[in-house]
Amino acid sequence: MMSTYKRATLDEEDLVDSLSESDVYPNHLQVNFRGPRNGQRCWAARTPVEKRLVVLVALLAAALVACLAVLGIQYQTRTPSVCLSEACISVTSSILSSMDPTVDPCQDFFTYACGGWIKANPVPDGHSRWGTFSNLWEHNQAIIKHLLENSTASVSEAERKAQVYYRACMNETRIEELKAKPLMELIEKLGGWNITGPWDKDNFQDTLQVVTSHYHTSPFFSVYVSADSKNSNSNVIQVDQSGLGLPSRDYYLNKTENEKVLTGYLNYMVQLGKLLGGGAEDTIRPQMQQILDFETALANITIPQEKRRDEELIYHKVTAAELQTLAPAINWLPFLNTIFYPVEINESEPIVIYDKEYLSKVSTLINSTDKCLLNNYMIWNLVRKTSSFLDQRFQDADEKFMEVMYGTKKTCLPRWKFCVSDTENTLGFALGPMFVKATFAEDSKNIASEIILEIKKAFEESLSTLKWMDEDTRKSAKEKADAIYNMIGYPNFIMDPKELDKVFNDYTAVPDLYFENAMRFFNFSWRVTADQLRKAPNRDQWSMTPPMVNAYYSPTKNEIVFPAGILQAPFYTRSSPNALNFGGIGVVVGHELTHAFDDQGREYDKDGNLRPWWKNSSVEAFKQQTACMVEQYGNYSVNGEPVNGRHTLGENIADNGGLKAAYRAYQNWVKKNGAEQTLPTLGLTNNQLFFLSFAQVWCSVRTPESSHEGLITDPHSPSRFRVIGSISNSKEFSEHFHCPPGSPMNPHHKCEVW
């Protein structure tokens, strides 16, 4: 995500903590003034020499008292006292239990900060990863459960719909009674599936239109509505590559390395086919293998994410007529008019596409593929998305595949956790008001706004010191930073029952019919998407719901968003020292702010438009600075598998810039407000606590399978390298922890972008 603040050394801090008031003036240093046994001598009886000596002694004593007073003031100013409040003792205990103080912080700061936490927190059953974010999300889940199960007369109609949805999910008796019937009826309604019975041979276009709009699936490609990157005040239809059942093309193309996953995926497909009435396995398996082979063909033409980072290069705006020429396998005008009905689409409709080559190749692939296989593949997309809403047999099949895919150990997780997560994913904004009222203090927005303001100021201070950026680009960058809009806690409309009900007016939840409610929501969410096409983008439309433990930056809106779910401990606690808050939520704020200037965000101007607003000299200098990080992170590995320094570049830039901005902001805060009290027993300065707080946010564990998946899909580096990658580039970290030059956490060569 420097000042006059005294950066006390570790030894000085320990000494101060060990002194009590009686120790400051030990008895053997006390001075007693005693007169003669016969009483004091009269002043008049003293000789002139004695009188002069007495006056001199008095003056010297007065001077000594003055000096002691000055030293006392300086002592109090420079030496923070120890915080012994209940909150400080509690947070100290938490910090200590997470640490492994036997590890040298200059050798391995992540293990120093998180070693205790990792030993005490193996990956829980039913999970493939666990960390600070997971812990807080479980806390939020428990709150949501209570709110959903305890309805009140004052809730809005939208909130009641969320409660109906949740209760239908919890009605396992009804779900078990229906078994696979809801999905089997849906497949029949769509014209059938050759895996389970007869199918309509002439309905390719119709099936594609229905599964795209009514059920929000994305076979072959994805279609959605979003702000036009080059005209951010307008929404536009956008089309992009899609259609893989596994998380990344790498799973299909690196067959030897991923043989276990591919076998598990095929077995999962066969099992679902059998559960849906597909008959004998020797009939189902060959057809499912064909679907898997088709997905492999899609993977072969899918562009890797690391080659799609330059948005100026991949952005193309075409008309519907031009798209028809580019990808003729789809009858685009009927397709678009059907899914966007009642909006009328003609041949001149602008459409943004992100990979011409992919769309051309997928069109060729469709034309050269048997219609039966195309139908099987499209219905498989629907089955894969909807089977989790069916009975326990489908849950068991899903868990078995998750064990292969992510290393998740099968467990009997409480049903309510599944239902809370699904309700939040589906109707998170509808239940948002309940969560906000229960957890979000009225002044939290103001406090968060103040922190954001401090981080922005610190970022702009760093911006002014950059040597690689020309002055014109620097001026424009400052204007962009000034223009970043803050969204905190929740979108305003959710707290107005009338506005909230208006948003969810067209969605109806039916008691006790879980599958039906989920299908209705897919259709509703697509209708909401289609409805945006002729409207301007709206800041109140968030990509994350209020309970989410996360944050994000939107380049087309030039805004940073912090849901209520993350504005809690351990990221922020009003009773904790600000060293911890700046190291927690401060770094999160700095991270999102820096995204406005990472390798993708920097391409958007202050108004959210994709255009070349940098001078060429600064673009080239930026590429040189970022090349350092690509190499640095590319040298890290997990279980012998390297981190992709190119794919993770944007997040690595944000991690480093966020830490730097938050540190500078904390120094500014101390300069303005004075040194804080320190925490007891740790023997750490507040500057050291800042870095420790940052690191402990990322304490986490993952299964080997999940680590592999993260390395090939996640744009973030693994947690360990988010910590050591950032602090090893921080000169201030090495100063505060006294790391020798050349030690692992203080390399001679450091990378810096912002």
Swiss-Prot record:
Zn(2+) binds at residues 591, 595, 651. It is a single-pass type II membrane protein. One of its GO terms (cellular component) is membrane. Gene3D superfamilies: Collagenase (Catalytic Domain) (3.40.390.10), Neutral endopeptidase , domain2 (1.10.1380.10). It is found in: Cell membrane. Belongs to the peptidase M13 family. This is Endothelin-converting enzyme 1. It catalyses: Hydrolysis of the 21-Trp-|-Val-22 bond in big endothelin to form endothelin 1. The active site is at 592, 655 (proton donor). PANTHER family: ENDOTHELIN-CONVERTING ENZYME 1, ZINC METALLOPROTEASE FAMILY M13 NEPRILYSIN-RELATED. GO terms for molecular function: endopeptidase activity; metal ion binding; metalloendopeptidase activity; protein homodimerization activity. Converts big endothelin-1 to endothelin-1. Residues 74-754 are extracellular. The chain crosses the membrane at residues 53-73.
